[in-house]
Structure formats: structure tokens, C-alpha cells
Amino acid sequence: QVVSIIGGILTAIFFLGFLVVASIIRTETSSLIIGCLFIITTLTISRRLTVPFLDAMNITLYIAGCALIAYGLNKSTNALFIALAITGIFTFFLSKGFILPFLSVILFIISFLGELAYLSSSIQLLQIAVVPVLAVFLFTNLYERDILTGLKENLVSKYTPFHSGLFVSCICLLAGLSVNYGIPAPYWLLSIFIWIGILLIIQ
């Protein structure tokens, strides 16, 4: 899965470069339309075929589609993050397999925090926004058996990519906040919640 994701990301970069060089993408509107077509194509392939070797192609089209949608909405940051969050939600429930639901969880969380960062540049708000993500990840770890028992049969397959997406998102969020650790800010807010989570896990 890791190799497929890395390969898909690299292919998406080269593919986007080709679209730019070939002048296929000339305006924000064309970028938005092509991006939506890529997302729809990816979801269609994912629902009809779950062949492993198609994972890399789905990743390529999905990442390229999200990047094109972001470029098409770059003049409206608020609409950009909302559109990406909605894309993540639809992808999670409409796609099959592991890769796309996994990426959709990461996309939704990034869009959610990006929207908060756009609305407020306060580091305190971002710390508070990280707490629900960490809390959901902690909850899924503590009550994994109960969650799997209570889920409907068609949603059980979504648990693994959901949990994996939360795990990767938590690592990226904590790493991202630590980059600006030298800037004076009340980081003790996030530290308190992290210690509470550790104590709950120990118990």
C-alpha cells in the first residue's frame, strides 16, 4: 500500500506537469472541470473494479483531481477548503477498497484544519482543533471491538482505512505544530489533552 501511494503521488506530479506543459489547463474553470472529472472517474473505477494494480492509477487521478480543484478555486480559499472537505466525505462513502477511503480521511482533516487556519491565524485555535482528531483516534483505539460490533456490515470494511487515516493525520498534525515550536505560544493547552489521553490508555 505504501509503495502504491508513493508511486501514485509521483505519477500525479508528473501528470500535472504534463497537463500544464501541454496547455490543456489554461484557466481556473477548465482546471476545476477537469479535476471534477478525475474525481468522478476515480470513484467510478473504484466502485466497479477493486484490482490491486489499479490502486496507483486511482491515487494518481484522485490526487491530480484534488490539486486541480484546489487550483480552480484558489481565488476563494473558503470555497476551496469546503469543496475539498465535501470531496473527502463523498470519496469515503462511495469508494471501495483501502486506498481512497484512507486518502479521503486525510483530505477531510486537512481541509477542516485549513478552514480553521483561514478563519483565524491563532495558534491556540489550531491546537484546540487538533484535540477532536486526537480524541477520535483515541476513542477508536479504546473501543475498537465495540465499534466493529456495532457497525453495519457494509461499513466494517471502512474501519481500517478510517483508523489508518486518523493515525497518519495525527502524526502529521503533531509534527506540523512542532515545526513552529520556537514561536511563543501556550503549547500547554495541547500538552494537557495529550497527557489525559495517555492516562486513559494506561488505565
PLM regions and their residue ranges:
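Alpha-helical multi-pass membrane segments and their bilayer interfacial helix-loop junctions
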Residues: Q1-Q203
